[in-house]
């Protein structure tokens, strides 16, 4: 039996759009009528409008005092061929106050055949003749990638990274334990995960990454995935110009200095004015702006203030020769009227692509936020800076901005972010504003003269900036509501056909472990309605979508790593989530991840929460497939929790603390400390608090390196026993209907 990687042959169905090109050539004898021509010579321009496409209104430049203008300007419209598309042509006269309509004509696009190109004359007022050149073609190369497979760049990265990892594992594990690494195919895929938890997660993850870097574990990892606070550390690390040549130790020193300041210092009038003016520029270009944009700027100014122009795309240079693990970031797409615990689509971000695996739709990072229609960009914007994405990835804190800044009266609303979030519904997070303020279809024909328009825009800008500044620096009504604080971007799936849904694991028998029974799937971990509507599709008619912190559903980025295309063997996860006390069970987020995985038919080891009762609180727990022979595609999970146990006694693994000063620095609680220095809402870490949390997670990681090494050795053995791991035979494909028919009909070697 031959084994294949079938994902590249699964067809993600999508309908092709049409590209309608209009060249406005010229006009002759433009007139305002006999009386009008006596008073003024026309200043003509042409406006084109098709109501059925998002970027619907376009216009030529105007010519002063010209009755025979020659424009030769080309415009493109992306159209849905199933719609009744009608081009409306309006001849306009530019005036100082309000432009004047000289004539209107219409043209049914359906009268043209695909591949046809022709010149069409239009007569206005029985005198003026205008010539347009029109052509219609199929958009056969959309800007979205429709596929269940990983992108070619990630595939290339994986191949290069495996060669690097093979040598690193041999060095780390020694000749005896690595004798099974004969080729790149024998190399297990290791992923490192960081949870959310605000600056607590960021600081804790900084200690983790330092330990993984020093121990050589990081050199054996293919992926590093983060959520919320962990993404802030990943962004800081990967955007640093000296990484990876300079390791986390020196970069963490810079981080400690950056987070020692009160974030309120960033809200000086001069800086606030600069923030809001840059957001006005974004808003006036036609992009949505929310409080998350401002929060992203504050996070960026705190963590990456000397590289605020860095983009996600620019991080490719950090992995272009597979010298580092590939960073993966995440947020959620949510609906305005549905709880994020019931419905949420996971959006993944890498330096190579951004997209949603649930729909098999991906795009280059520089296109995220641009206007799309039917998979094609209709209006391209500049790539959003990394700090904007940092605000989106951690947007729970913009939703609860009053807690972050300590606005009066807000401190009594709950001691942890999780308690606050329990009271949030998506309708609190997301404004119900489905309209487009930049929607050309609602604009009147014509525009004001540029001089008059600039005066109006200046007044409008001043008013908007004033409102935003007052909302930001005062205890205004905006701080007493969570409305509209979610990130908002143009819907890149606008107009697509989602009649066919694609399970995250579209191949049967891919996960052969014992499946959950109905009672287990029905059992609630955190909420009776959790994941109830996760199979629902996105609204492809909504012009904008809301993107929020993934921690609002569960606080570990497992969905990125569990994609079967990535074939991860070993997951090392670090959970910095808040708990009621230091002695509380630490598995809530992991149990939610397990339930989500089972509902999506993805391999996941059985999480036994009673291990806490049997073994007590530990620095890490190992969860393995019960039957590796049957569950050959199930990963092993090493789950680190935030706990101060052995660190109190040892300053390094095996090195006891001796002096009172050494013992005192390590004698602290995480969640039981009444002063809450490690609160989820603490955005200022004095050096001592930073060092304590950083050094704790650095120690906990190093103290369990042997556990990680042992799991690596076992993963190598699993690979040896199952050389076809994460490959699938065609006879086991449940979703044959998704496959390219030509591929299915080919004879197999």
Swiss-Prot record:
Regulation: Activated by cytosolic calcium, which is necessary for binding to membrane lipids. Activated by phosphorylation in response to mitogenic stimuli.
A GO CC term assigned to this protein in UniProt: Golgi membrane
Residues in cross-link Glycyl lysine isopeptide (Lys-Gly) (interchain with G-Cter in SUMO2): 541, 606
Pathway the protein contributes to: Membrane lipid metabolism; glycerophospholipid metabolism; Lipid metabolism; arachidonate metabolism; Lipid metabolism; prostaglandin biosynthesis; Lipid metabolism; leukotriene B4 biosynthesis
Domain C2: 6-122
List of residues binding Ca(2+) 2: 40, 43, 93-95
Listed EC numbers: 3.1.1.4, 3.1.1.5
Residues with the Phosphoserine modification: 2, 434-435, 437, 505, 515, 727, 729
BP terms from Gene Ontology: arachidonate metabolic process; glycerol metabolic process; leukotriene biosynthetic process; monoacylglycerol biosynthetic process; phosphatidylcholine catabolic process; phosphatidylglycerol catabolic process; prostaglandin biosynthetic process
SMART domains, alphabetized: C2 (SM00239), PLAc (SM00022)
Domain PLA2c: start-end pairs: 140-740
Post-translational modification remark: Phosphorylated at both Ser-505 and Ser-727 in response to mitogenic stimuli.
Modification Phosphothreonine occurs at: 268
Chief localisation class: cytoplasm
Ligand binding (Ca(2+) 1): 40-41, 43, 65
Subcellular location: Cytoplasm; Golgi apparatus membrane; Nucleus envelope
Function: Has primarily calcium-dependent phospholipase and lysophospholipase activities, with a major role in membrane lipid remodeling and biosynthesis of lipid mediators of the inflammatory response. Plays an important role in embryo implantation and parturition through its ability to trigger prostanoid production. Preferentially hydrolyzes the ester bond of the fatty acyl group attached at sn-2 position of phospholipids (phospholipase A2 activity).
Protein name: Cytosolic phospholipase A2
Organism from which the protein derives: Pongo abelii (Sumatran orangutan)
């Amino acid at each position: 039996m031959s084994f294949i990687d079938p994902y590249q042959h699964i067809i993600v169905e999508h309908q092709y759009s049409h590209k309608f090109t209009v060249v406005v050539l010229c006009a002759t004898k433009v007139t305002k009528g006999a009386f009008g021509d006596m008073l003024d010579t026309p200043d003509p321009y042409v406006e084109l409008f098709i109501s059925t496409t998002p970027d619907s209104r376009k216009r030529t430049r105007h010519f002063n005092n010209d009755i025979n203008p020659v424009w030769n300007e080309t415009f493109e419209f992306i159209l849905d061929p199933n719609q009744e598309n009608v081009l409306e042509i309006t001849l306009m006269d530019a005036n100082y106050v309000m432009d004047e309509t000289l004539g209107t004509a219409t043209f049914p696009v359906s009268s043209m055949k695909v591949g046809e190109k022709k010149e069409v004359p239009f007569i206005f007022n029985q005198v003026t003749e205008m010539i347009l050149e029109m052509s219609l073609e199929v958009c056969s190369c959309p800007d979205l990638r429709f596929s269940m497979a990983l992108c070619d760049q990630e595939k290339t990265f994986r191949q290069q990274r495996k060669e690097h990892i093979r040598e690193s594992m041999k060095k780390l594990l020694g000749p005896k334990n690595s004798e099974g690494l004969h080729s790149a195919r024998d190399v297990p895929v290791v992923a490192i995960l960081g949870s959310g938890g605000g600056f607590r997660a960021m600081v804790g993850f900084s200690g983790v990454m330092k330990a993984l870097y020093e121990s050589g574990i990081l050199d054996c990892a293919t992926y590093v995935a983060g959520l919320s606070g962990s993404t802030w550390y990943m962004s800081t690390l990967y955007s640093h110009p000296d990484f990876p040549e300079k390791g986390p130790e020196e970069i963490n020193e810079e981080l400690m200095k950056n987070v020692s300041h009160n974030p309120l210092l960033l809200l000086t009038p001069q800086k606030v004015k600069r923030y809001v003016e840059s957001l006005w520029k974004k808003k006036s270009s036609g992009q949505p702006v929310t409080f998350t944009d401002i929060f992203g700027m504050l996070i960026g100014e705190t963590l990456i203030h000397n590289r605020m122009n860095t983009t996600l795309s620019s991080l490719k240079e950090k992995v272009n020769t597979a010298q580092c693990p590939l960073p993966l970031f995440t947020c959620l797409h949510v609906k305005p009227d549905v709880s994020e615990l019931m419905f949420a689509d996971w959006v993944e971000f890498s330096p190579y692509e951004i997209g949603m695996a649930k729909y098999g739709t991906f795009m280059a990072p520089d296109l995220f936020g641009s206007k799309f229609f039917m998979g094609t960009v209709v209006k391209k914007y500049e790539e959003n800076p990394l700090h904007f994405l940092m605000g989106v990835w951690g947007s729970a804190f913009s939703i609860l901005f009053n807690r972050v800044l300590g606005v009066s009266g807000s401190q009594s609303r709950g001691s942890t972010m999780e308690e606050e979030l329990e009271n949030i519904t998506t309708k609190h997070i997301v404004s119900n504003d489905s309209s487009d303020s930049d929607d050309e279809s609602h604009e009147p024909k014509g525009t004001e003269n540029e001089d008059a328009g600039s005066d109006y825009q200046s007044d409008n800008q001043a008013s908007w900036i004033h409102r935003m500044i007052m909302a930001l620096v005062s205890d205004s009504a905006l701080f007493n509501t969570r409305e509209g604080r979610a990130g908002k971007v143009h819907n890149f799936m606008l107009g697509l056909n989602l009649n066919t849904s694609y399970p995250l694991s579209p191949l049967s028998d891919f996960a052969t472990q014992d499946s959950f029974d109905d009672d287990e799937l029905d059992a609630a971990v955190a909420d009776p309605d959790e994941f109830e509507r996760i199979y629902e599709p996105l609204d492809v008619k909504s012009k904008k979508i809301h993107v929020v912190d993934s921690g609002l559903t569960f606080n570990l980025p497992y969905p990125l790593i569990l994609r079967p295309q990535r074939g991860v063997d070993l997951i090392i996860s670090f959970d910095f989530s808040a708990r009621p006390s230091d002695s509380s069970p630490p598995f809530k987020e992991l149990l939610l991840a397990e339930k989500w995985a089972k509902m999506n038919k993805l391999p996941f080891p059985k999480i036994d929460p009673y291990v806490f009762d049997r073994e007590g609180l530990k620095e890490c727990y190992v969860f393995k497939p019960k039957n590796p022979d049957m569950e050959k595609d199930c990963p092993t999970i090493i789950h680190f929790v935030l706990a101060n146990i052995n660190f109190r006694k040892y300053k390094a693994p095996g090195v006891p603390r001796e002096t009172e000063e050494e013992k005192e620095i390590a004698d602290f609680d995480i969640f039981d400390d009444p002063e809450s220095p490690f609160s989820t809402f603490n955005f200022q870490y004095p050096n001592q608090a930073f060092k304590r949390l950083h050094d704790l997670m650095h120690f906990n990681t190093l103290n369990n390196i042997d556990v990680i090494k042992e799991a690596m050795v076992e993963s190598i053995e699993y690979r040896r026993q199952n050389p076809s791991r994460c490959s699938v035979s065609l006879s086991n494909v449940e979703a044959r209907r998704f496959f390219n028919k030509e591929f299915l009909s080919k004879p197999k070697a």
